[in-house]
Structure formats: C-alpha cells, structure tokens
Swiss-Prot record:
SMART domains: PX, SH3. Residues 286-391 are annotated as: Disordered. It comes from the Eukaryota. InterPro entries: NADPH_Oxidase/PX-Domain, NCF1_C, NCF1_PBR/AIR, NCF1_SH3_1, NCF1_SH3_2, P47PHOX, PX_dom, PX_dom_sf. This is Putative neutrophil cytosol factor 1B. It holds the Pfam family p47_phox_C. Keywords: Cytoplasm, Phosphoprotein, Repeat, SH3 domain. Residues 157-216, 227-286 form the SH3 domain. It is found in: Cytoplasm.
Length: 391
C-alpha cells in the first residue's frame, strides 16, 4: 500500500453557525486523497492559523525565520476577535491561495504528518444539524469563478454531475428536496448511501438511489465483489423488508462481500447472502458506541422501492442477482474449506521438494576394511602385539 498524501484541497465556502455563539464560522474544504476519495471537512479560521504557526515552527528555514529570502511557506494573516461575515468572505480568497500554495510545496512539507492530520475527517465533520435547533446554520458557497489559479497546480477538483430519477421530499432540514430531472453536483459520496449535493445555491443530503449518472445508468465507481469478505458487526438491528435482504440483531457478526455506493451492501451470514444497510454496520474491532451515536437518520430507500422512476437511459443498471452472489459465495467457501483441511503435502510444496532432494542425494560409500599386512605395516607397536596375540 502506498503512502498517504493529499492530492488537492479546494475551498467550497463557509458555514455560519449560531451555536455556541453568533460568530461561529467554519470553512468548508473538499480534500482529495491519494486514493481519489473526496472528503468534506470544516475548520475555523483560528484553527487554520494555529496549524499555520505550528507548520512554521516545524520548518523554520522554509518559513523564512533564518533568512526571509528562503521563505516558501505562504503567509496567513492573524485572525481578529470580531471577524464577521464580511471578513469570512474576504478570507475565502486568502485561504484558496494558501491551500493551493501548500500543495505545491516540497513533499516533506505538503505530506508531513502535521498537515495530513489537520485535514483528516473528524467526528465533528460528520455531525449533521439536528432538526430541533431553533436556527439552522447558514451556508455561503464560493462562486465558481472565484477560484484562484493557484489551485490549478495540482489540478482542480471537478464535481460529478447526477440527475434525479424521481421526486424526493426531504424529511429533515439537513436534506435537499428534488424534482424529477433536477441536475445536481455531488460533493461527497458517503458509504451510508446519503450523498451531499449542491444545486445552484442549495446544499443538502440526498439518497444515492434517487440519482443516476448522466452518461450511463451504471455506477462506474462501484467496486468489484470481494468474496473473501470483510468482518463487520451490526450496530443496529434491522428486519428485512425485501426478499433479497438479510435480518440481523445488534451485535451479530457478518462478512461484507460487496460494498455498493447506494448504501446497501451485500453481506454473508454463514451461507446466506443478501442486502443490508451499510450505515448499520461497523468494522470488527472498532468502537461500536461511537458509530451508534453517529446514526442520525434511517437507511436510505432502495432503488427498487422508488415509484415513478424516469431514467434518461434506455437500459437499466447492471446488477448481480442474489443467485449469482450465492453461487459465487458458496464456491469460494468450498474452496477455502478444502484448503483448510489437513492432508498430504502437494507435489509442488516447499516441504515436499526438500524431502525429494534429500532422497535423491547419494549416500557416501563405506570404505573397505584394511588387510592384516597393511595394518602391520602402518600401525603402532602396541597394536602389532595385540594382533600377534590374537593370532
């Protein structure tokens, strides 16, 4: 596995929150990692400035502390106590240029652990505003023509465009309503099957099952099945609704064999395979209680449950049937059980090759017993006397 690094950082805008204070502003960054995954993170300007100060302390030469002419780390103005919305808007251009310059620095800086840790997803980045908040956060997006050319150094992030196949009525303030035919840009594809999208000045979460790519009905980013399976644990009970789904109780262990982007993964429980909501699963060995607290809504609807679907494509999506999953899974399990059985070593195994080599080596010849005359000529006087007495 290669080293972890960031390919690109793009500023999307800022969010004005009214909890805990009126002046709580967070900037939204879209971070593209080495595996092409894109994550949205939120950072306050004071946090960014503290990160900047630590970075300068770590690299004093590149920060110009010794010789100002050697400075390559970009400048960042200190925050003011009463920065309001106008200041937040002004900071956007500064932060866009700052992030672009960071990505163009030598790898010892642009890929240092301090920078990577700062832009990793935190638990707060995943928290959605609750419906009982008296005043919702206000989101201000960067204009598309307001991006600095400095971000072109590593290549800009192009958001994918999808089309709504049916009407969707939002069920919470953090979601976004859709009408059939609406075209949206996808900012983040969550494994839960809820995607964060934007349409003009609106932003919100949408079930992936209500969206289709413009160029093909198939989702090209869906990975291939992995019949070896990954161990997961159910963190919330679920009762199957469709015949191709699996019911699980909280705490039951399963193997995930296909991670689909619509949030409905194919799992294996003993020899049974079927669909299960990914947001109710957690990798084995990880903190279950924290994952349970992050469940803010129900599982997204499946495509098969959506009524009045209108697709622009002539053919439907290519999907493996449950029979295909079951056959391939059984075949893999049988092969794994055969390999696990103890038995004679195969002809090509290293142990058998070593045994064959030992058998093929010629044994050393036993030398003949010397004659009595030869012994008398070459032995000592005491040996001669013993031989004479024996005769």
């Amino acid at each position: 596995m290669g080293d972890t690094f960031i390919r690109h950082i793009a500023l999307l805008g800022f969010e004005k929150r009214f909890v805990p204070s009126q002046h709580y502003v967070r900037y939204m960054f879209l971070v593209k990692w080495q595996d092409l995954s894109e994550k949205v993170v939120y950072r306050r300007f004071t946090e960014i400035y503290e990160f900047h100060k630590t970075l300068k302390e770590m690299f004093p030469i590149e920060a110009g502390a010794i010789n100002p002419e050697n400075r390559i780390i970009p400048h960042l103005p200190a925050p003011k106590w009463f920065d309001g919305q106008r200041a937040a808007e002004n900071h956007q251009g500064t932060l866009t240029e700052y992030c672009g310059t960071l990505m163009s620095l030598p790898t010892k800086i642009s890929r240092c652990p301090h920078l990577l840790d700062f832009f990793k997803v935190r638990p707060d980045d995943l928290k959605l505003p609750t419906d009982n908040q008296t005043k919702k956060p206000e989101t201000y997006l960067m204009p598309k023509d307001g991006k600095s050319t400095a971000t072109d150094i590593t290549g800009p992030i192009i958001l994918q465009t999808y089309r709504a196949i049916a009407n969707y009525e939002k069920t919470s303030g953090s979601e976004m309503a859709l009408s059939t035919g609406d075209v949206v840009e996808v900012v983040e594809k969550s494994e839960s099957g809820w995607w964060f999208c934007q349409m003009k000045a609106k932003r919100g979460w949408i079930p992936a099952s209500f969206l289709e790519p413009l160029d093909s009905p198939d989702e090209t980013e869906d990975p291939e099945p992995n019949y070896a399976g990954e161990p997961y644990v159910a963190i919330k009970a679920y009762t199957a609704v469709e015949g191709d789904e699996v019911s699980l109780l909280e705490g039951e262990a399963v193997e995930v064999i296909h991670k689909l982007l619509d949030g409905w993964w194919v799992i294996r429980k003993d020899d049974v395979t079927g669909y299960f909501p990914s947001m109710y699963l957690q990798k084995s060995g990880q903190d279950v209680s924290q994952a349970q607290r992050q469940i803010k809504r129900g599982a997204p609807p499946r495509r098969s449950s959506i009524r009045n679907v209108h697709s622009i494509h002539q053919r439907s999506r290519k999907r493996l049937s449950q029979d295909a999953y079951r056959r391939n899974s059984v075949r893999f399990l049988q092969q794994r059980r055969r390999q696990a059985r103890p038995g004679p070593q195969s002809p090509g195994s290293p142990l058998e090759e070593e045994r064959q080599t030992q058998r093929s080596k010629p044994q050393p010849a036993v030398p003949p017993r010397p004659s009595a005359d030869l012994i008398l000529n070459r032995c000592s006087e005491s040996t001669k006397r013993k031989l004479a007495s024996a005769v």
